[in-house]
A protein has these predicted regions:
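Non-catalytic alpha-helical scaffolds and adjoining flexible linkers that form interface surfaces
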Residues: 1-23, 28-58, 62-165
Length: 165
């Protein structure tokens, strides 16, 4: 039996242990959307995936569809992402807001651009990143993106309130 291998760039949002040596990773991909993938044996020392697929990393990842979960078959680290609070909070919000496996290339591009940027990770960076996430998910209007910082934060809070989180 042959399996189709899906390869895409992905931002690893989180991981959780499963069994003795396995982990389930939550990865936002350009082509597949939000994917929960099982990496078998990744916690063992000789694992080929170890180090290439860690939370807060941008990686080229390959999956095959399993019965319960996607299975992670390979990963190649592109860049580590800062775990500074101004970066970690928007990525955690992203994981909460995206439901299911629906592709959203515009959202992925906006998040990838923020992740790869050299801007300092401060309150303004965080507010801009959250506003882009909420805009691409339909919680903010285009006109909200040009507001000053105080009004932008009010618009973000209204968007979050609309999401019922």
């Amino acid at each position: 039996m042959s399996y189709h291998i899906y390869t895409s760039r992905g931002i690893v949002l989180s991981e959780r242990p499963m069994r003795e040596a396995d982990r389930i990773y939550t990865v936002m991909t350009r082509d597949l959307g939000l994917v929960r993938a099982l990496a078998t044996g990744v916690r063992k020392e000789p694992s080929k995936l170890r180090g290439n697929i860690e939370p807060f990393s941008l990686s080229a990842v390959s999956f095959v569809k399993g019965r319960e979960y996607w299975r992670l078959t390979s990963a190649e680290l592109i860049q580590r992402i800062s775990s500074a609070p101004a970066m970690a909070r928007p990525l955690a919000l992203l994981e909460k807001l995206i439901q299911g496996e629906s592709s959203n290339p515009e959202l992925f591009s906006a998040v990838e651009e923020a992740v790869l940027s050299t801007e300092p990770y401060n309150e303004i960076f965080e507010a801009n990143m959250v506003s882009k996430i909420l805009f691409h998910l339909g919680y903010l209007k285009k006109s909200d993106m040009t507001l000053d910082k105080k009004d932008l934060i009010i618009a973000i809070n209204n968007g979050l309130q609309a999401s019922h989180l």
